[in-house]
């Protein structure tokens, strides 16, 4: 079958209402700025620091269901129902397994996994009603193949993968997709603070022989938020310089 010009044409751009949780710094900020540059209406959540210039900010703690609801209500009043959700907010609290307290384990799960559930559940209301939605979860390579001293963090990110795939199946009939972007070693304040020996050791396992940039993660999110990605759902896309060889 020969494709026509129309079949091969790029779909028209549609400006969407976007919410990026934890979009005031690091990878989240790069994502928010890229989506705004693409032409979307972008809101970000923060914990009291305020929103970067050019972005609409709402204060929100994703571990608090009421705060999540208030944040969504504010975004809806400002720019309409959330059509693209980027669940990025989270934290880490690394420790050796024998020294990791149950409190530390549950704190990370509550922020990274249950927090992602809270925002996804709230976003699903309007997405199902309007028969359109893009949910993009920021995971980690740790969630696919584990990293020492990160039992809590790895468990939370592995859980995000399972949750995203369940959402992808459940909400497909409402034209809602759900995908995970899994960054590897990315140049952020956290990685720059690591001991030089640790940084060099990590590079040994990266075929690209360099750290990634937040902008490179943002580029993948930009694609998943676009009309070009309408047939992609339930995917886990690593941005890791080949470290996990696609896993």
From Swiss-Prot:
Pathway: Lipid metabolism; mycolic acid biosynthesis
A family per Pfam: adh_short_C2
Regulation acting on activity, per entry: Phosphorylation alters the activity, and subsequently mycolic acid biosynthesis. In vitro, activity is efficiently inhibited by isoniazid. Acts by forming an isonicotinoyl-NADP adduct that binds to the MabA active site.
UniProt main location, coarse: secreted
Record's keyword terms, sorted: Acetylation, Cell wall, Fatty acid biosynthesis, Fatty acid metabolism, Lipid biosynthesis, Lipid metabolism, NADP, Oxidoreductase, Phosphoprotein, Secreted
Catalytic activity: a (3R)-hydroxyacyl-[ACP] + NADP(+) = a 3-oxoacyl-[ACP] + NADPH + H(+); a (3R)-3-hydroxyacyl-CoA + NADP(+) = a 3-oxoacyl-CoA + NADPH + H(+); (3R)-3-hydroxybutanoyl-CoA + NADP(+) = acetoacetyl-CoA + NADPH + H(+); (3R)-hydroxyoctanoyl-CoA + NADP(+) = 3-oxooctanoyl-CoA + NADPH + H(+)
GO cellular component terms, semicolon-separated: extracellular region; plasma membrane
Subcellular location field: Secreted, Cell wall
Outcome when changing residue 140 to A: Loss of activity. Can still bind NADPH
Molecular function via GO: 3-oxoacyl-[acyl-carrier-protein] reductase (NADPH) activity; acetoacetyl-CoA reductase activity; NADPH binding
Residues bearing PTM Phosphothreonine: 21, 114, 191
Enzyme active site: 153 (proton acceptor)
PROSITE patterns assigned: ADH_SHORT
Site note Important for activity, residues: 140
Annotated positions binding NADP(+): 25-27, 47, 61-62, 90, 153, 157, 186, 197
Enzyme Commission numbers on file: 1.1.1.100, 1.1.1.36
Example GO BP: mycolic acid biosynthetic process
EC top class named in words: oxidoreductase
Modification after translation: Efficiently phosphorylated in vitro by several M.tuberculosis Ser/Thr protein kinases (STPKs), including PknA, PknB, PknD, PknE, and PknL. Thr-191 represents the primary phosphorylation site in vivo.
Family: Belongs to the short-chain dehydrogenases/reductases (SDR) family.
Comment field on protein domains: Shows a significant rearrangement of the active site between a closed inactive conformation and an open and active form in presence of NADP. The C-terminus adopts a particular conformation that locks the conformational changes.
Quaternary structure, from the entry: Homotetramer. Homodimer in solution.
Remaining remarks: Restores respiratory growth of S.cerevisiae oar1 deletion mutant.
Protein name: 3-oxoacyl-[acyl-carrier-protein] reductase MabA
Species of the source: Mycobacterium tuberculosis (strain ATCC 25618 / H37Rv)
Source lineage: Bacteria, Bacillati, Actinomycetota, Actinomycetes, Mycobacteriales
């Amino acid at each position: 079958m020969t494709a026509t010009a129309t079949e091969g044409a790029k779909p028209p751009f549609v400006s969407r209402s976007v919410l990026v949780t934890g979009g005031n710094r690091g990878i989240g900020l790069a994502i928010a700025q890229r989506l705004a540059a693409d032409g979307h209406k972008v809101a970000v959540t923060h914990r009291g620091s305020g929103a970067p210039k050019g972005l609409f900010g709402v204060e929100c703690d994703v571990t608090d269901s009421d705060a999540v609801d208030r944040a969504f209500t504010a975004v809806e009043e400002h720019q309409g129902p959330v059509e693209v959700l980027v669940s990025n907010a989270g934290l880490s609290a690394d420790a050796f397994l024998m020294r990791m307290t149950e409190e530390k384990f549950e704190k990370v799960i509550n922020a990274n996994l249950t927090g992602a559930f809270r925002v996804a559940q709230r976003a699903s209301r309007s997405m199902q009603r309007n028969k359109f939605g893009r949910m993009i979860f920021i995971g980690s390579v740790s969630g696919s193949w584990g990293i020492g001293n990160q039992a809590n963090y790895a468990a939370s990110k592995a859980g995000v993968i399972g949750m995203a795939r369940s959402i992808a199946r459940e909400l497909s009939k409402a034209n809602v997709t759900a995908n995970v972007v899994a960054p590897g070693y990315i140049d952020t304040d956290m990685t720059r603070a690591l001991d030089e020996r640790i940084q060099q050791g990590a590079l040994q396992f990266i075929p690209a022989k360099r750290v990634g940039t937040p902008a490179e993660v943002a580029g993948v999110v930009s694609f998943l938020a676009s009309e070009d990605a309408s047939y992609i759902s339930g995917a886990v896309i690593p941005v890791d310089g080949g470290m996990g060889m696609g896993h």
